[in-house]
Amino acid sequence: MNHTIYTDTEKNAIRFSNFKQLEASCAFTGLGVKYVAAGEEIYYANGKKYKVKVGDYIIGNEFTKSLVQINSAEAVQGLCIDISSDIISEVAEFHDVNGSELKEFLLSDQFFVNRYNVKNTSLGYSLHEINQKIKTGVFSNDLQHNELFYSLAESIITDQRFVFEHLTNLDFKKNVTNEEVFRAILHAKLLIDERITE
């Protein structure tokens, strides 16, 4: 089951999914977030495999070519949020000290598709909170204005600005090498964060 919670003419959307079995192409609109609330989803995005477990999410944009697979005895629940390119552009331009470089990074084929954990990002708290409100049926009041999507865009840009700044400082000849080294650094940071919180 894929249930649309909210959609508007500006291409902002929130959907809640609940599947045991699924294999389908998975489009990202504007800047899209796929959050796993229960179970595990496997994404193949731009030729790379991501196991997205409960509490994790993946971010992509319109250039991200993706396939999702779910194969579980228990229901796998997910939250899909699309934030329009216009909102991302507006918020990125406000935060970008280097002209349009951050906006270009976020909305082009240069975007760094990756899996993140809600505990380690600005966006994570919002995703967890939205999911809880949807499950308890108290979410509709938050959708009176576009403020929610601007707030989510702010969180994404806070997180992705860190990624952008560090990724552009890596100086390997191939972009793929920069991305793999940075993924390894992020994974090491995640392991350290998990050990500290134990």
What do the predicted segments below correspond to?
Residues 2-105, 135-143:
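N-terminal regulatory/effector-sensing and dimerization cores
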Residues 118-124, 128, 146, 165-198:
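A short, Lys/Arg-enriched amphipathic alpha-helix from helix-turn-helix/homeodomain DNA-binding modules
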Residues 99-163:
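Amphipathic alpha-helical segments enriched in hydrophobic/aromatic residues interleaved with Lys/Arg
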Residues 20-22, 112, 170-174:
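A short, mixed-charge helix-start or loop-turn motif at secondary-structure junctions
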Residues 29, 151, 181:
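Short, conserved glycine- and acidic-residue-centered signature motifs
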